[in-house]
Amino acid sequence: MTILNIAAVDLGASSGRVMLASYSTENHKISLEEIHRFKNQFVSQNGHECWDLAYLENEIVNGLRKISNSGRTLHSIGIDTWGVDYVLLDQNGEVVGPTYAYRDHRTDGVMQKVQAELGKEVIYRKTGIQFLTFNTLYQLKAMTDENPAWLSQVKDFVMIPDYLNYRLTGVINREYTNATTTQLVNVNIDSWDTALLDYLGLPASWFGRIRHPGHQVGLWENRVPVMSVASHDTASAVISAPLSDENAAYLCSGTWSLMGLDTTTPCTDECAMNANITNEGGIDGHYRVLKNIMGLWLFNRLCTERDVTDIPALVKQAEAELPFQSLINPNAECFLNPSSMVEAIQQYCREHNQVIPKTTAQLARCIFDSLAMLYRKVALELAGLQGKPISALHIVGGGSQNAFLNQLCADLCGIDVFAGPVEASVLGNVGCQLMALDQIHNAAEFRQLVVKNFPLKQFKKRPHFMPASDFEEKWCEFCALN
């Protein structure tokens, strides 16, 4: 029996891991082992929020060396990260300028300026990407306006996972799923939109050819293949979401919550634009028609501010609080990166004549209720786009462990919710590597392996969780916030 040892590097906005997947080519068992975990956080450079690339590279290599030093033969490596953030390289492959983080405030007001100059509908028809203030399009516009002197130094533009692959292999590869998060890829041709690049005043030569995942980029230390995976972590997570049928939706639940459909065609009509739906690239010729929701970022910040160490206990305390006393719009800009999340929530409730949550449990309940309400709203929008009701919701990622929020989601959306796998991005990363290693052929085949190896938990709508008239009142209150 042959065991393939596959390293999946999974970087998030607050932490990173090097995971080792062991895959049996005989019985198709997959096991996961965390080899190395490290913190990730913004670093301040000249008043801007940035990423420390040298630190990330060093931690990744530390994790890979731990595997090598354990005596196990490593068969391949893949890296996935968040989207939208990029690196500029000069002709020697050295980094030009800081590597800004998407929560940096330099893009404040830039999106509105670009929309006014180009036209919102024009941008959306070209790219199919939802309008978020930190999309790469607006980051680059801020850069060209503020630091035009850098332009003459730059030879290559790469996304962060492509940069890390380059550091491991010396080879530049521009991976499709992450490239689509930039709002610079034309959804009709799956290539860079030259008109948008011209608008920014940037040469097409910076950007190079986009390639789909599932192939070898190069070798680490001249011996271990580094594979191009679905390097946007959400794209990897969707690969491992064991969708029950074509009308099932997924919810990648973590720092961000991303709810969507796995489709063969993008949706860029006026209804999709008005709903701020995004059409990000997937694999096997599919698109991720989805919506970004601020997600557990709000809860994580609450726990940090209130020094919460026992998160399961706080979730239970929140469950015991009265429901729907305070509702917020989790996607409101004031929650993107406030100096105090507690104060931001309380101020929002004050401005919208809501009950002001004070205790940590009340604040947590406010967050969970509001997220579940927003999940319901997005599910209804997605159903409207596809012309069919959502049949089931598959919640994957770390947030799928929150049974209370899963149950709220089933109650409010009125459909069965299936939770798991927890390590969705890691598994999707592994799945792409297995495709590159010719062990499996497509996402559908890999999802069957996921179900066999990682049991799901099912949540059904409770028939009498709240009187219909009371809920309708709260639902109307929430919709008025959006």
Curated annotation (Swiss-Prot):
Cofactor(s) essential for the protein: Mg(2+)
The protein's enzyme class: transferase
EC number(s) recorded for this UniProt protein: 2.7.1.5
GO biological process assignments: glycerol metabolic process; rhamnose catabolic process
S-S pairs: C349-C366, C409-C413
Record Pfam families: FGGY_N
Domain of life: Bacteria
Catalyzed reactions: L-rhamnulose + ATP = L-rhamnulose 1-phosphate + ADP + H(+)
Stored InterPro entries: ATPase_NBD, FGGY_N, Rhamnulokinase
GO terms under cellular component: cytosol
GO MF annotation list: ATP binding; glycerol kinase activity; rhamnulokinase activity
Protein role: Involved in the catabolism of L-rhamnose (6-deoxy-L-mannose). Catalyzes the transfer of the gamma-phosphate group from ATP to the 1-hydroxyl group of L-rhamnulose to yield L-rhamnulose 1-phosphate.
Family indicated by similarity: Belongs to the rhamnulokinase family.
HAMAP family (UniProt xref): Rhamnulokinase
Name of the protein in question: Rhamnulokinase
Organism name: Mannheimia succiniciproducens (strain KCTC 0769BP / MBEL55E)
Lineage of source species: Bacteria, Pseudomonadati, Pseudomonadota, Gammaproteobacteria, Pasteurellales
